[in-house]
């Protein structure tokens, strides 16, 4: 296994504060452990924003105090997210009305 992963899966989520505690319990005790059992997933770690968030769109900067959660998974290959195990594990459907998310696989640029 090389020092650097072949690719990354980045999951960024904003959670409605009304379900944030429930979301965190579920993510930490069910979702993340299940994800780490999937073939091709080396490891993963969750992060949460600290302090004010600054976003710039079309030259306009906005600041916000909302929390953003980011999970970084190291994958053996981009197809790791297409396995049956990964597709079964994905489901956070019961939280769908309460989250805004972005998921993307990142591969080496060069």
Placement of each model-derived feature along the sequence:
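Macromolecular interaction modules
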Residues: 1-110
